[in-house]
Amino acid sequence: VIVNEESAAIPRLERTLLLLLGFAEKNPGISRILNGDALAGETDRLRTRVAQFYDRLETQLKQIVRDAEINEAIRPTVPAACAVNILLAAAEGRIGQYVRSEFKRPPTQNWQEQWQLLMAGFFRESVAQKPQHSLARQNSSVA
């Protein structure tokens, strides 16, 4: 759905990760599973499914970056796999903090500022200097 609604890479990446963080925030039990907490005594099948989920998400993010290279003529500052890995690691880290805080520190807290920081070094300078692509800026101008 996000891929069909957004044509530009930055909003697509942001909305995809924000969807993950928002879902985790609204579903603490799933957050534990995504973080690996609830998997200690679980079957290998569940552990495998979580790994597959993250692999598929990473593949989708890589596709967004590759599409940006083709359709928007922008490239990340490092190889796509490396660039996407840091985005996913940031989102996973936010979920981990949420679980460790006993669900007192929402994964979306301060995400917009962190997103701006991540994007500042993500794409080559021509895009990194255009923070207006952020959903936070779009939403704040609407209010």
Q: How should each PLM-predicted stretch be described?
A:
Residues V1, G41-R45, G93:
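A short alpha-helix capping/helix-coil boundary motif
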Residues V1-I30, A80-L87:
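Hydrophobic alpha-helical connector segments
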Residues I2-V3, V65, E69:
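Conserved hydrophobic residues forming the short capping helix/wall of the S-adenosyl-L-methionine
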Residues R12-R15, L19, R49, R56, ...:
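Alpha-helical elements of Rossmann-like donor-binding domains used by nucleotide-donor carbohydrate transfer enzymes
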Residues G22-K62:
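Short secondary-structure transition hinges
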Residues A24, L61, V65, A91-Y98, ...:
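Hydrophobic recognition helices of helix-based DNA-binding modules
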Residues S31, N35, R47, E69-L117, ...:
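Hydrophobic/aromatic-rich alpha-helical bundle segments in the mid-to-C-terminal region
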